[in-house]
């Protein structure tokens, strides 16, 4: 019984460390640009990158081995890893389906409607502001353009 309790304690500790380390982090990630306020959020990839992905996602989705191969470190990597890319755990779905936010897995992950495939994002436990999700939905509705 003691070994089981130690094992459960180790698992809980590992999960907590993972969740805490995936927060907005310190340093450049999650910080507004030096010398000014954050630019307004618009339904363009560059704006979403600066205001959402770089602020709320790169704490986990960066580096050499990001979760599910999804690097969101730059607008280029975000576009390459999101638009028309199959979901690794369910290749019948795509991460971002241009013109169709209701069939874009990214929206399901952000809204917590992803079903049994993983957890809602961002993982740190605080849901993304609905106004940010609405702008991402609009970007997808507009065709999820790179420009």
Predicted regions and their residues:
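Solvent-exposed helix-loop boundary motif
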Residues: 26-41, 46-130, 134
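Post-cleavage N-terminal segment of exported redox proteins
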Residues: 1-43, 137-147
């Amino acid at each position: 019984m003691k070994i089981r309790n130690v094992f459960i304690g180790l698992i809980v500790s590992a999960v907590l460390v993972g969740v805490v380390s995936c927060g907005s982090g310190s340093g450049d990630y999650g910080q507004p640009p030096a010398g000014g306020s954050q630019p307004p959020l618009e339904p363009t990839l560059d704006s979403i990158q600066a205001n959402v992905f770089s602020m709320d996602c790169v704490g986990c989705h960066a580096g050499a081995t990001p979760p599910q191969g999804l690097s969101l470190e730059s607008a280029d990597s975000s576009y390459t890893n999101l638009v028309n890319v199959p979901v690794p755990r369910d290749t019948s779905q795509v991460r971002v389906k241009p013109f169709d936010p209701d069939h874009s897995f990214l929206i399901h992950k952000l809204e917590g409607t992803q079903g049994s495939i993983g957890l809602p994002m961002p993982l740190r436990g605080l849901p993304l502001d609905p106004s940010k999700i609405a702008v991402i939905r609009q970007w997808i509705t507009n065709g999820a353009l790179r420009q």
